[in-house]
Amino acid sequence: MIFDKLILNHNVWEKLSSAVNNNKVPNAFIFSGIDGTGKEAHAIEFSAFLNCKRVVEKKYPCGDCRSCLKVRSLNHEEIYLIHPTPPPKNKSDSNLDQKVIEEIYKNYKQKLLNPYHKIKIGNSKTIPIASIRGLKKKLFFSKSDENWSVVIISDAEKLCTQ
C-alpha cells in the first residue's frame, strides 16, 4: 500500500482490482463523494496498483517496487495530479509561478503524511485551461507501453475555459 493511514473502501477496491485482474479497465473512473472520504487517496492508490510491478494478492500495490516508490513520493512520470491553481500570469504560458510550485510541493508533502489532506493552493477557485493544455502535451509525448497513464483531476467541476 502507498498510504498506510488510508482506510480502504473494500467494496470499491474489490471492483477496481477485479477490473484490473480481468483486463477490463475502462478508460475513466469517477471517484465522487463528500470531502474527507479519501477519494483522491483511493485514486492515487489505484494508480499505484495499475503500475505496480509486484502486486500483492492480486489486489494491492506492493509499495516497494520502483513504480510504487515513485507514486509514494507523488513523482511518477505517468501519474498526473490536476487541481485548482492560480492561472499563469501569461495566458499563453502554462508554467506556474515559483511560489505556487512551492505551495504545491508543500501540499504534496502533507498529502503523503495524511491521505485525507485536501490539496489547496492559495485561494484558487478554478483549474485553468493552461493546465489541461500542458497535460495534453505531456500525455501525447510521454506514452509508455509498460505503464498506465493516469490523470487524477481533483475538483473537476472547477475546470474552466480561460
Name each model feature, range by range.
Residues 2-159:
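Clamp-loader machinery-focused feature within the broader ASCE/P-loop NTPase space
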